[in-house]
Amino acid sequence: MTVTNKPVEPANVPVMDFEAIHASVGNERKEYLRQLDEAWSHHGAVYVINHSIGTETLEEAFVWCKKFFDLPLAVKNSVHIPPDVSKHFQGWTGTGEAISSQGVWDPDEIERLRKEMPTELKEAMELQDPCGTYPPGNPDLNLVEQHLPGYLDFLKKWFAACYKQSLQNMRLVCEILGMEDLDYIGKKFEPRHMSTHSTWNYFLGQPVSQLASGSSNRLNAHTDYCQFTMLFQDMVGGLELHDYEEDIYRPVPPIKGAMIVQVGDLLEKQTNGRWRSALHRVTAPSRYMYGGSPGGDDELVQRYSLVFFGHLNLDEMIKPLPGCEKPGKWSTLEWKDLMTAGQWLARRVALEYERKTAATVM
């Protein structure tokens, strides 16, 4: 995509007030649920304000995020993500080590894309619940704690807060789908079972002109492979959502304190296509991309984001939820085989992070 003087309108993603929803009854509540249903069907995403993750916790998370990425390279390398990341999904990755893609399943094709596509100029820290028990092989986050005292305690706080909000999301899903047991999904979504995951992202500063011309990149277009994504942006911007009707990407501007709740691949499959897995990407802020402000060759400010993924328990089969027997509109990714949530996660993670052979690692 190139810079254009023609404005691109932001995605018409609705803003939902969760405090108001939880306090509502009767017809008012039915209308709120209808709006959520429509948003997840049409956009695959919704802004949420007045959620249960307090402003103080969110601001603290961004402080810790920046502190981590400001650490010396040697410290970050000490918790580098393992080569067999599909089995040990935790650790830091540097620029160019991962590649986001959509609908590409052939490892040879992924390697070709790595060589031909612009490098995603970002670092990431993949995090599992610090209270969980995992097979040997994960990086030891105590190595970070030695340089950032209090880091692990905050991670416990962060995961607990995000898990609580995720359960609220799942109860609303059950209510929209007409389930009697509003904890039906939550019972198959347990912490410390690799069902919760968080990614902290740092997008490097780079010339605006490179991003706008497509010669440089921040995050390729992709869907998320979870049930729900809870995304927290800083105020820099750059997130874009695919508009299927117009076949263009539209900006999703940050709203201070809000989170964006996106439908992932698993939930699209579980709702049998009723809701769409949100295809999205990260590029330059819209004021640079679409003619609002000439970026020139000035350095683009850095960007940080915090992401929390709710994932079905790994041993659960992926199949339609009760009430979703009738196929819906969406089929973002064709799945030929019935598989468990763990198999799906391993497949997507391996394509994003694992290299075909050790000799190809840059």
UniProtKB/Swiss-Prot annotation:
Function: 2-oxoglutarate-dependent dioxygenase; part of the gene cluster that mediates the biosynthesis of loline alkaloids, potent insecticidal agents composed of a pyrrolizidine ring system and an uncommon ether bridge linking carbons 2 and 7. Lolines are structurally differentiated by the various modifications of the L-amino group and include norloline, loline, N-methylloline, N-acetylloline, N-acetylnorloline, and N-formylloline.
UniProt-annotated binding residues for 2-oxoglutarate: R303
This protein's name: 2-oxoglutarate-dependent dioxygenase lolO2
Binding site for Fe cation: H222, D224, H280
Organism placement in taxonomy: Eukaryota, Fungi, Dikarya, Ascomycota, Pezizomycotina
A biological process from GO: alkaloid metabolic process
Molecular-function GO terms, alphabetical: dioxygenase activity; metal ion binding
Disulfide bonds: none
UniProt cross-references to PROSITE patterns, sorted A to Z: FE2OG_OXY
Organism: Epichloe uncinata
Keyword Calcium: no
Mutant phenotype after disruption: Leads to the accumulation of exo-1-acetamidopyrrolizidine but no lolines.
EC number(s) reported in the record: 1.14.-.-
Gene: lolO2
Biotechnology annotation for this entry: Loline alkaloids show broad-spectrum anti-insect activity, and different lolines may have different biological activities. In vitro tests of NFL, NAL, NML, and semisynthetic loline derivatives with long carbon-chain acylations on the 1-amine have shown that many are effective against both fall armyworm larvae and European corn borer larvae, but the effects seem to differ depending on the modifications. N-Formylloline reduces the weight gain of fall armyworms by deterring feeding, and does not significantly affect corn borers.
Family: Belongs to the iron/ascorbate-dependent oxidoreductase family.
Cofactor: binding details: Binds 1 Fe(2+) ion per subunit.
Record has DNA repair as a keyword: no
Pathway: Alkaloid biosynthesis
Cofactor(s) it depends on: Fe(2+)
The entry's keywords: Alkaloid metabolism, Dioxygenase, Iron, Metal-binding, Oxidoreductase
Positions of the Fe2OG dioxygenase domain: 199-312
